[in-house]
Amino acid sequence: MPCLKVVQGSNHQGNEKFGETAGMQCTCCSLFSVAFTLVKSPGYWDRKDLDFILDNGDRIYKTLNTLRYLMFPDLPRQILLFETQVVQVDFKTNKFGFLNSQSVPGSLLGRNVSSDTNGLLLLVRGLCVSVLWTKRDFYLFDSHSKNDKGECTPDGCSILLKFNSINALGVEG
């Protein structure tokens, strides 16, 4: 099933504007993208929103005072969304497993979609993305360098892909 909508940011998390943290902060960017759904539905996100998410994901990463890739337990439990709005992060469950060529991402993810959450973080081969949802649609946010089809490219941008079914989601490293 094809992607219904593509939004691209101005750059990606590995951009030199992020300095020494460039390329390290995908987990924080993904976390911030889930929090950002509380103030703006991903169906209305535009280029500026993706840039805002990258900038704030980088800001969160820099507050952790590390220069390494993060795992979920390393993430903060509170996020400053705007100057006065703090969001509590609730990691309902951590599930670990293996994906192989026979794995169906939609069926694996579908078991974790519920009406009391608005997104999840997916860590595959060391790369973190977020899967977001509304009542009707599913979205894949990726802070890495992607082209307008969601494929890896050295000169790409962060991306938000929209699907009408979780089974349509494909995750490419």
Question: Which residues does each predicted region cover?
Answer:
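Cysteine-dependent deubiquitinase/ubiquitin-like isopeptidase catalytic cores across multiple families
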Residues: M1-G173
